[in-house]
Amino acid sequence: VYVMPGLGGIKFSDRHASDTAELLTKASPDYIRLRTLEIFPGTPLESLQKNGEFQEAPEEQVVKEIRTIIENTDTETEIVSDSAANLLEINGSLPGEREKMLDAIDSYLDLTGREKLEFSLHSRLNSFIGQYGGLTGDIYEKLTPFLNHNTLNISGASDNEIRSVITLIRGKLMP
């Protein structure tokens, strides 16, 4: 079964997570694959977003959705997070590895706002490089001010600069 954290947007995030956990408990699938929502250009969801009918949930809220799903799904199953769209790699079996997965999520949630941004950037960069074998020119150009001998140092980057790179990368990742 594929589950799409973030599909409820900001408005329905909590309900989406709790309803998903309830449905998964009833369905008792062998595998649950997490595929975080990505809004692609030219899609009906992008149109809804542009006209204000849909507000995309921020990454932290999506991570909280995943936490709710794992915490409240009461069945034997495997959780697999193998999509480039996912911020965190959360893999394990329920119920046996529930605490391990929740601990990994809580480690992220315990980060400061800046640490979450930096984590997101590194996660997205690793996903992109893993998927495409390198960076595109536009991503490289945005990172150039923060590269020193091919080592990324974003300590001098503003939060908005980091968000801008994350947005660019997410727009290019294939789910």
Located regions from the model:
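Auxiliary Fe-S-binding modules of radical SAM enzymes
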Residues: 25-33, 37-175
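Catalytic cores of alpha/beta
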Residues: 9-26, 88-90
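Residue-level signal for functionally critical sites in structured catalytic/ligand-binding pockets
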Residues: 2, 17-20, 83
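Mobile, glycine- and charge-enriched loop segments
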Residues: 1-10
